[in-house]
Amino acid sequence: MKTLRRLLLLVLVVLCSLLFVQAQPKHKASKPKPVSCSQGTPYRGCPACGTAKDNKHRTLNVQKNRGTAVTSPQKITVQEIRNPANNTKFTPSKKVWVTGYVASVDPGGFQETCNCKRNDLRDVHINIVADPSEVGDQSKYVVVEFTPRWEKRFGFDDSNYDAMRQAVEDKIKGKWIKFSGWMLFDFIHANASQSTAPGNPVCPNDGKQHSGCNWRATPWEVHPVTAYTVVSGP
C-alpha cells in the first residue's frame, strides 16, 4: 500500500511539473531593433527611412532619400555601371556623373515604402543606354531616378504626378543627358536585372509590367540624381 501511494504521489508531482512548464510564457527569438529614423531629413512629413520595417530596407530608403547634392563626382560610363564584373566594386557612398541616352521616362514605383506609400510622393524612373541603338533592349537599361526631394528643385511641378512625368519626358527623352548623383544598389530588383539574374529572359518592351524577366541591366542605379544637363553626346 505504501508503495502504491508513493507511486501515485510521484505521478502527481510529474504531472504538476509538466503543467507548470506548459503554462510558462514562450519567449520568441528577439528581432534586431529597427535602425533609428534620425538619419537623413524628413520631407513633407515622410522620414528618410520611409515606412520600411526592417533595417535593410530602412537603410536602402535613407540612401534613396538623400537630400545633399554630390560634389566633385567621378566620371563613370553606362557600360561600367552595367558590367557584372563591377557589381561588388561600387558603394552607395560613391558620387558619380554619367552621360547616357534617355531611352524612356517611366512612372516610378507606386506607393513605395521610401515615399511612405503616399500617392503624392513618387519617383520618376529614367532608363538610359550607352547608344541610341540599344533603345528597346531592356537588358541594356541603366536606371537613374528623380526623387520627390529633387523634382521641385529641378523646377517640376509635382502637384500632378502624370503631368510632371510627362514634362520630364518632354525635356529629356531621346536626348543625351549628363546626370550627377549618388550610386545605389537597389537589391529589391536583383531578380530582374541582367547582371544578377542572367538566366532570365528579357522582358518585352511593350510598356507593360512583367514578372520573371529582366527589365533592367543591373540593380546599380544613380539614385537620387542631384543635377542634370542636356549635352551633345557622350
Describe the residue ranges of each PLM region.
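Bacterial N-terminal signal peptides that target proteins for export
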Residues: 1-8
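Bacterial N-terminal signal peptides
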Residues: 9-18
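Sec/Tat signal peptide C-region and signal peptidase I cleavage site
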Residues: 19-23
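OB-fold and OB-like single-stranded nucleic-acid-recognition modules
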Residues: 24-234
